[in-house]
Design a protein with these regions (language model features):
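Positively charged, amphipathic and often flexible ligand-engagement surfaces
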Residues: 1-279
Length: 279
């Protein structure tokens, strides 16, 4: 956070909720819907760690993107983030919660959150992504014999993502949006929705984002047109960051498609420069 602000790298930071405490406790609270007396002390420590991050971000005038995790621990995270939005999203939208659109229930969740905040002065921060744990989610659902929370096809996931975009822009006065996608069609849709709502390209209500080193053709094109663009740089131990990136490549076909296109564009640029040098 200090590095980003000091060197004007970004106004956003990201953190993984389970880095703040026990995954088992997040799972237990998500399942039970309450904190048992025996877990109160440990849960309060987790809440305090969240607060330390949000307080530091407020001092630095930065924004915090809270990562989404597996469905069986997400409810506790959602509830904790929601409670903190009520506290911190007053002066500006400090906290953004991540919604994974590959879960078929997330559009309904988005509408529920909107309804809860409706009529208040609180602005809802949303980081909208497709999701990164598809194989893990489906595997667990099969093993434990319950219905998978994941959309049955990529087409349905795309519909879920794009419908969430449409809902947010329809109610853009109540939202601040951070769009994390390598999908060209979804990025184009967001641009069209901004035009429909007569928003400036540079509106601070909307940010576009791709992973650092991936889909640069999308990032550069958006930035050239004046849209707000951020490149996500995963930070952490190599043994954790590499699997993180591999999951996103394996489970997001848009990245694979974009990689092929980027290679094609790079080859064209190399050929163009060769011709320039020959002349």
């Amino acid at each position: 956070m200090e590095e980003s602000k000091t060197h004007s790298i970004s106004d956003f930071i990201v953190f993984k909720p389970t880095s703040m405490g026990s995954i088992k406790l997040f799972e237990k609270i998500s399942k039970n819907g309450y904190v048992s007396s025996k877990d109160t002390d440990e849960w309060n420590k987790i809440k305090k760690r969240f607060k330390l991050i949000f307080d530091a971000a407020k001092v630095k005038q930065m924004k915090v993107l809270v990562d989404a995790e597996e469905s069986w621990i997400q409810k506790a995270i959602d509830d904790l983030v929601f409670d903190n939005m009520l506290i911190y999203n007053n002066d500006y939208t400090l906290i953004y919660n991540t919604i994974q659109a590959y879960r078929y229930d997330r559009l309904d969740y988005l509408k529920q959150i909107h309804q809860k905040f409706n009529g208040s002065h609180i602005k809802i921060g949303v980081k909208l992504v497709r999701g990164a744990y598809m194989q893990k989610e489906n595997k667990r659902a099969r093993e434990l014999n319950y219905k998978s929370p994941i959309c049955k096809s990529k087409v349905l996931t795309d519909e879920s993502f794009n419908n969430s975009l449409k809902y947010i822009f329809k109610n853009i006065n109540d939202f601040f949006l951070f769009i994390g996608t390598h999908n060209e069609k979804s990025n184009l849709l967001a641009m069209k929705l901004m035009q429909k709502e007569k928003m400036e390209n540079s509106s601070d209500k909307v940010w576009f984002s791709q992973l650092y080193g991936m889909s640069d053709n999308i990032s550069f094109s958006l930035a050239k047109k004046g849209y707000n663009v951020a490149k996500l740089i995963p930070f952490g131990p190599v043994k954790e960051v590499i699997p993180y990136l591999m999951r996103r490549i394996e489970e997001n076909t848009s990245i694979s498609e974009q990689t092929n296109r980027e290679l094609s564009l790079i080859r064209k640029e190399i050929e163009r420069r060769k011709k320039v040098n020959l002349n």
